[in-house]
Amino acid sequence: MSSVSPIQIPSRLPLLLTHEGVLLPGSTMRTSVDSARNLQLVRSRLLKGTSLQSTILGVIPNTPDPASDAQDLPPLHRIGTAALAVQVVGSNWPKPHYTLLITGLCRFQITQVVREKPYPVAEVEQLDRLEEFPNTCKTREELGELSEQFYKYAVQLVEMLDMSVPAVAKLRRLLDSLPREALPDILTSIIRTSNKEKLQILDAVSLEERFKMTIPLLVRQIEGLKLLQKTRKHKQDDDKRVIAIRPMRRITHVPGALADEDEDEDNDDIVMLEKKIRTSSMPEQAHKVCVKEIKRLKKMPQSMPEYALTRNYLELMVELPWNKSTTDRLDIRAARVLLDNDHYAMEKLKKRVLEYLAVRQLKNNLKGPILCFVGPPGVGKTSVGRSVAKTLGREFHRIALGGVCDQSDIRGHRRTYVGSMPGRIINGLKTVGVNNPVFLLDEVDKLGKSLQGDPAAALLEVLDPEQNHNFTDHYLNVAFDLSQVLFIATANTTASIPPALLDRMEIIQVPGYTQEEKIEIAHRHLIPKQLEQHGLTPQQIQIPQVTTLDIITRYTREAGVRSLDRKLGAICRAVAVKVAEGQHREAKLDRPDVAEGEGCKEHLLEDGKSDPVSDTTDLALPPEMPILIDFHALKDILGPPMYEMEVSERLSQPGVAIGLAWTPLGGEIMFVEASRMDGEGQLTLTGQLGNVMKESAHLAISWLRSNAKKYHLTNASGSFDLLENTDIHLHFPAGAVTKDGPSAGVTIATCLASLFSGRLVRSDVAMTGEITLRGLVLPVGGIKDKALAAHRAGLKRVIIPQRNEKDLEEIPANVRQDLSFITASCLDEVLNAAFDGGFTVKARPGLLNSKL
């Protein structure tokens, strides 16, 4: 744009005060507006204006940034630039501000400030509305020489730039098309100059003065380019370039000056990264992608956001274990010993691991199986996965999936997103550093689902042996072979696992422990671990097996051993206090009035009884005397028993029966209570029951009504119509727990039969099974867990469906010896087994025979 402004600016202009940058006529600048005065100017003048005149501002440079807008107007620079506001962009982050794109029109001089608030307005005099050259011959000759000299330097500078031929030609045409008097302002704004130098050019109202001040700036720029070209011939370093014009490139390094250490280190890292790519054993497709990305990285300025993203991507690619693996230990005998030492029981699980080792001995390229351990909490599913990795000699990595509801956690984020990263599978491989680790996918049944996708669906490819050799993470965007990874998933139940995902896994049930197994686990693993954690030794505390049994039966009721472990920890803490007190109070123990051995009353007596620990609260034990924990000590440490054998008490009247239920926490016993009263034949069900269990109750009452005469069942008035003038209420205790499922059918029928017959159900019997309207008993699941629950509760007889007889083989031998299992195919057999003396059938009346 020419210095000779084609626009007549208003005589009164609003002033935009800037403290960074200098706008010259003919140049364009972006500036941020965040002070109160400037914000008022933008909102009142630019955003509400409707004419061209309203978009013209007076830009005053070098204005001090005020500490507060409430202060008086700071001193203003005498010369400013009239500017045209081309664009206004607003934002509220991190605070309200506007970004203006303004173009300089001409110089002006402030004659008088007419208003200071809400934004300053001044009377101005437009400058540099001059003729192109003055009329006097001498001045015209001087300006002509200066103009030619300036133009020559400008052309020389353009031709020395490291640019393509078309770009240089375009700049030449631009120089030729602009008026000579406009060139000083325009070139000053685009070459490397300081704000102080630009301010001097702005103050130079005379055209001759501007030429004289600008020519040295061009010469300085040209000399710098010459020096750079001379250095390049010797060093052949194409990475360090000097670009003079700001919109294109900048001088990043001046030859002869000290090199930027960070830049040199970064260049060294890129060289090392390129070397790692060349020497890596990644597949051909991944290698091509890395070569392409490293070429892009070399051409990027370090200030670009994509530079860091690309570098992180390449570093991940070279760190992944594409072909690095560990050698499996295939000694089956050693593996069996290791598994037995780490875990007690779990024979089915150990058998499957040994089978895998045996097949690996016969076939080296066997694909890793996809195992899923299903069982209640606390039975050791996660620790077994760690033991499997230890047995195989592989690296172990656990991935917690509980609550994960974003498929990107599995597949990763695409690199187009800010903060993108690989998924947990690829990140886990990077962590372990080998391509054949043992991955434990913990709590796979607790995966969520959200708007970000379904992570269970993303696992389909990971857990499919036919597909995971070509697994593609969104972040990598190249295939990675997962076929050598041994995936082990854990779950409490298979009900919440999608069928497609469940079909890809080999399910191995991990049932709860029996009381005998818990005692062995406690004395083999839990007690030594707690002693070590609390700094105790076996010489300081002794927990006999009978005490462990009391903890299991009276203070815990679970399928696993977590609560047992916590109770043992509480005992160790209490003993640690006694031991610590004894170490600090040994002098007290040597008092003459204390007889020998009187301070250790915790030892068991000959008849098996002992004095409680609380007897010695006033007298601490010496550290060498062991403390024996018995039931009385348990009451002092753990409080009164939480569970009692109350089965016989709760079955002391008709209308109560015991059922067996399965939960994700293991098997449980379940009481069913029934009561009848005068009414209109309604059936009331309480206890948070699901639809299936409600239907089982209706089936049971319908079967009993149809067989009332057969068993001589009557209501209170003696009628065989059991619901005639009678209401029935069925209740399932523990009302806060949701209950559902068909396996309570036989229990409900037995409970109602007890109610209407007035007979007591045996107090040592529990039952499970689904019923039909015709009285058949159908098979149910979870027989082993239910049997263990009956065994824990001290029951002696368990009634199961006849078609579940095959499941008895999974029950431990000691449990089968303690329990009497009765199989039933119909409700008649169930009732006969549930009542003492059987449930007799009334004889049918004789039938009339006719013979012709």
From Swiss-Prot:
Keyword field contains Acetylation: yes
One record GO biological process: protein targeting to peroxisome
InterPro entries in the cross-refs: AAA+_ATPase (IPR003593), ATPase_AAA_core (IPR003959), Lon_bac/euk-typ (IPR004815), Lon_lid (IPR054594), Lon_proteolytic (IPR008269), Lon_Prtase (IPR027065), Lon_prtase_N (IPR003111), Lon_prtase_N_sf (IPR046336)
Domain Lon proteolytic residues, every copy: 651-837
Keywords: Acetylation, ATP-binding, Hydrolase, Nucleotide-binding, Peroxisome, Protease, Serine protease
Catalytic site positions: 743, 786
One GO term describing the cellular component: peroxisomal matrix
SMART domains reported in the protein's UniProt record: AAA (SM00382), LON (SM00464)
Pfam families in UniProt: AAA, Lon_C, Lon_lid, LON_substr_bdg
Subcellular localization, as worded in the UniProt entry: Peroxisome matrix
Placement of sequence motif Microbody targeting signal: 850-852
Annotated binding of ATP, by residue: 375-382
HAMAP family documented for this protein: lonp2_euk (MF_03121)
NCBIfam families for this protein: lon
Reported function: ATP-dependent serine protease that mediates the selective degradation of misfolded and unassembled polypeptides in the peroxisomal matrix. Necessary for type 2 peroxisome targeting signal (PTS2)-containing protein processing and facilitates peroxisome matrix protein import. May indirectly regulate peroxisomal fatty acid beta-oxidation through degradation of the self-processed forms of TYSND1.
Subunit structure: Interacts with PEX5. Interacts with TYSND1. May interact with enzymes involved in beta-oxidation of fatty acids, including ACOX1/AOX.
Protein name: Lon protease homolog 2, peroxisomal
Annotated source species: Bos taurus
